[in-house]
Amino acid sequence: CDDMAKENFREMMKEYPTKGIHFIDGGNYHYLTLLWLSLIEEPFDLIVFDNHSDMQKPAFGDVLSCGGWIRNLVEDSGFKGKVTVVGVDKDNIDKEMKELGVKFITKQTILKKRGQQYGLENELIDKCWTGKRPVYISVDKDVLDEKEYKTNWNQGIMSVDELFAIIEDT
């Protein structure tokens, strides 16, 4: 997504409020979350449910993409809130982003905590919730097990029920 495309998307987004639920395609446009976040004027924390870290450096210049929008947020935007990514494999954690304060709840932690009452919810609260700022939640559908929802990306292990329970209990 180059600068001209970003401006086109921003123009389209103006007619929608930042508060609420935004459904954006099947996962190819998760990077548009960064544009939504740029419209929020008050401090907030971010929780991202995703099977991928979305923290890759751009392959083609300074282009915003689904593979690197969280890196853009942390490195370039002056974002001061906490960022927590839920669902990524432990082997795919970006060490540089971890050093910059991004927290991760891995696929392995989800499996370990599965079945424990409030296990994952407590993990999420401990890692990211300050109680001082609102929380923006972004869900990439590829965090879900493919039995729950089929995307065109490799997928995670969460059920829809797990995802909703975590969001409701957090």
Regions found by a protein language model. Give the residues of each.
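Conserved alpha-helical scaffold segments that buttress catalytic/binding sites
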Residues: 1-170
